[in-house]
Amino acid sequence: MQVDLQSSAQSAHALHLFHQHSPLVHCMTNDVVQTFTANTLLALGASPAMVIETEEASQFAAIASALLINVGTLTQLRAQSMCAAVEQAKSSQTPWTLDPVAVGALDYRRRFCLELLPHKPTAIRGNASEIMALAGIANGGRGVDTTDAAANAIPAAQTLARETGAIVVVTGEMDYVTDGHRIIGIHGGDPLMTKVVGTGCALSAVVAACCALPGDTLENVASACHWMKQAGERAVARSEGPGSFVPHFLDALWQLTQEVQA
């Protein structure tokens, strides 16, 4: 199994495209991470919108550059809104990304996510336990936390990618991105990133935005992982702990965009 490493040059090119296109991202994400997700997208040059009402969600999915479905705080009413948005995204050819938070641990959200898969997500982003559960290989995870190493989920990610046509991202100490055939690995980041709520969810929003960019979607999605890990490393170097990490992380994302424009 060959894993190609993401190049800094490709990531810089994708970030330049990102800034040029400034994707409008419809984030149907969980209540815990909305502000952090929006600020992450803004720092990179995208435009976030958090539209959740069923009638509006369907309408907005048609005009957005990309749609994110994150089931972290799923309710039946929210599920209805998400279904309406996904159906409209499919009709409007709006790329959409699924973040199957904690599907390995909870039955309702696992059933809901499995019902969404026939609508052909452009990308799926999760930790190892989530991806393995969604692929039907194993159920597990401790809530939103993984109990499996990212590398162990590569076969499940490849299977899921081939079955759905999605780019599948498995995040961990090393991230892996696959279309079912090619596999790209992304080094970096820091364990402190796991002590801040929302870093994975925010990555899913950036992945969604990258699905709206022209060019190689696999490379663009891998670039999203690279930016987040780069920014995480820079932020940790300036931080004293989780509390000071967040502002330094947002600053680091902003600085990355400034560097590619210089």
UniProtKB/Swiss-Prot annotation:
Coiled coil: none annotated. Pathway: Cofactor biosynthesis; thiamine diphosphate biosynthesis; 4-methyl-5-(2-phosphoethyl)-thiazole from 5-(2-hydroxyethyl)-4-methylthiazole: step 1/1. Pfam families: HK. Disulfide bonds: none annotated. It is an enzyme of class 2 (transferase). The keyword Magnesium applies. Gene3D superfamilies: 3.40.1190.20. InterPro entries: Hyethyz_kinase, Ribokinase-like. Keywords: ATP-binding, Kinase, Magnesium, Metal-binding, Nucleotide-binding, Thiamine biosynthesis, Transferase. Substrate binds at M50, G198. Its cofactor is Mg(2+). Its EC number is 2.7.1.50. GO terms for biological process: thiamine biosynthetic process; thiamine diphosphate biosynthetic process. It catalyses: 5-(2-hydroxyethyl)-4-methylthiazole + ATP = 4-methyl-5-(2-phosphooxyethyl)-thiazole + ADP + H(+). GO terms for molecular function: ATP binding; hydroxyethylthiazole kinase activity; magnesium ion binding. ATP binds at R125, T171. Belongs to the Thz kinase family. Catalyzes the phosphorylation of the hydroxyl group of 4-methyl-5-beta-hydroxyethylthiazole (THZ). HAMAP family: Thz_kinase. This is Hydroxyethylthiazole kinase. It comes from Shigella boydii serotype 4 (strain Sb227). The gene is thiM.
